[in-house]
Swiss-Prot record:
This is Basic phospholipase A2 B chain. Ca(2+) binds at residues 27, 29, 31, 48. The keyword Zinc does not apply. Its EC number is 3.1.1.4. Belongs to the phospholipase A2 family. Group II subfamily. D49 sub-subfamily. One of its GO terms (biological process) is negative regulation of T cell proliferation. InterPro entries: PLipase_A2, PLipase_A2_Asp_AS, PLipase_A2_dom, PLipase_A2_dom_sf, PLipase_A2_His_AS. One of its GO terms (cellular component) is extracellular region. It is found in: Secreted.
Amino acid sequence: NLFQFAKMINGKLGAFSVWNYISYGCYCGWGGQGTPKDATDRCCFVHDCCYGRVRGCNPKLAIYSYSFKNGNIVCGKNLGCLRDICECDRVAANCFHQNKNTYNKNYRFKSSSRCRQTSEQC
């Protein structure tokens, strides 16, 4: 669920880091359109696409099992859609960490005027 996803992000990037991704670029936060602005925004685009492929439960609400081991996110013995959601969130949190050097404060607080291009397909 979104709370667990936030905890993954904070676990990889430090306390309160999730706030940097709530409204960023064209895809981080609720909804999304246009072309991702940078590698960080692409992490959100890929995460949105991943959630879009989940069948059988609501990715924003479903509770799954995971832990941190040696700084790595490890999804637990989840079945079906819970496994899929955990993997979506794990991959995105790792993506944010791997691309933290691309984070651009100018893209915070996304604006629909910056995201008017035709949206990419998943």
